Swiss-Prot record:
One of its GO terms (molecular function) is 3-oxoacyl-[acyl-carrier-protein] synthase activity. The gene is fabH. HAMAP family: FabH (MF_01815). It comes from Campylobacter jejuni subsp. jejuni serotype O:2 (strain ATCC 700819 / NCTC 11168). The keyword Acyltransferase applies. The lineage of its organism: Bacteria, Pseudomonadati, Campylobacterota, Epsilonproteobacteria, Campylobacterales. It catalyses: malonyl-[ACP] + acetyl-CoA + H(+) = 3-oxobutanoyl-[ACP] + CO2 + CoA. This is Beta-ketoacyl-[acyl-carrier-protein] synthase III.
Length: 324
């Protein structure tokens, strides 16, 4: 039966590395403290002349090629980001469409913070299985450095830049089995990008987070969510080939891994080298596993994410891309 399948995965990783040692020179922190609390050792930072759309475009071109398609085969572009090129418009998706030479196609952004890629999978699955679209390009892209206060040691240590992309199309096998998304806006003030309005045309954005509260809710929510999606689909955790979570904090990842009783071999962890890249983190981690030969065609994959909003989600899929 023809159903939605993730036919490719790719990423773009900026060259510049911002290490914990570098941050020690910028704010009152230490490599030991950052590593112990987060598991992060370094993160990537885009250059000044790279916008979020540029990062997304580079990942998109690789994803399209790996799906054995051309840009003109794409009939919808969906982007998840909390760091768009422009504050209101045009959308980052429209900028990427322009970069790819595409017009007269659907292109829009969604705002679901770190859960963004899960939300994209759900939307792309619905679009292709309804027959409205054939090949949907989904992109998580972030230049979080553009909204980061590098004087705030509580948050600047966490985030990095990057992009990941994939193509969702119909296929007879290796389907996106299930996607679950949810939200609770009552906790919105615990993790937000605050707007400080200097004038009607001049605004400064900065990310703010109450980390301890976010940590507790994230662990409980994600642990319950992954258990529920597995039970709903009559799948045992031990049947999962790879668990690829949002890369926010090593302690959160390990807590959910322990809940599922999964071995380290089945858990993909990249937070140590990229930090939290928000909506880009899952596809970036997937691409690392793909290029390392760990993610193969037909593998059963469990994804999960939690982000500002609060938003969260999980997905079960059999990877439909050709082996690297």
């Amino acid at each position: 039966m023809l159903k939605a399948s993730l036919k490719s995965i790719a990423s773009y990783i900026p060259e510049k590395i911002l290490s914990n040692a570098d941050l020690e020179k910028m704010v009152d922190t230490t490599d030991e403290w950052i590593t112990r609390r987060t598991g992060i050792k370094e993160r990537r930072i885009a250059s000044e002349n790279e916008n979020t759309s540029d990062l997304g475009t580079k990942a998109a071109l690789k994803a399209i090629e790996r799906a054995n398609l051309k840009p003109e085969d794409i009939d919808a572009i969906l982007v998840a980001t909390l760091s768009p090129d422009y504050f209101t418009m045009p959308s980052t998706a429209c900028k990427i469409a322009s970069n790819l030479g595409l017009v007269n196609i659907s292109a829009f952004d969604i705002s679901a913070a770190c859960s963004g890629f899960i939300y994209l999978l759900e939307q792309a699955k619905a679009l292709v299985e309804s027959g409205l679209k054939k090949n949907v390009l989904i992109i998580g892209a972030e230049k979080t450095s553009s909204i980061m206060d590098y004087n705030d040691r509580s948050i600047c240590i966490l985030f990095g830049d990057g992009a990941g992309a994939g193509v969702v199309s119909l296929d007879n096998e290796n389907h996106i089995l299930d996607v679950h998304t949810a939200s609770n806006g009552n906790y919105g003030d615990l993790l937000m990008t605050q707007r400080s309005q200097k004038s009607s045309l001049c605004q400064t954005l900065s990310m703010q987070m109450k980390g301890n509260e976010v940590f507790k809710i994230a662990v409980n929510t994600l642990s319950n969510d992954v258990v529920e999606i597995l039970a709903k689909n009559n799948i045992l955790a031990q049947e999962i080939d790879l668990f690829i979570p949002h890369q926010a904090n090593l302690r959160i990842i390990k807590a959910v891994q322990e809940k599922l009783n999964l071995s380290d071999e089945k858990c993909v962890i990249t937070v140590q080298k990229y930090g939290n890249t928000s909506a880009a983190s899952i596809p970036m981690a997937m691409n690392d596993a793909y290029e390392e030969g760990r993610l193969k065609k037909g593998n059963l994959i469990l994804l999960d994410a939690f982000g500002g909003g609060f938003t969260w989600g999980s997905a079960l899929l059999k990877f439909g891309g050709e082996n690297f």
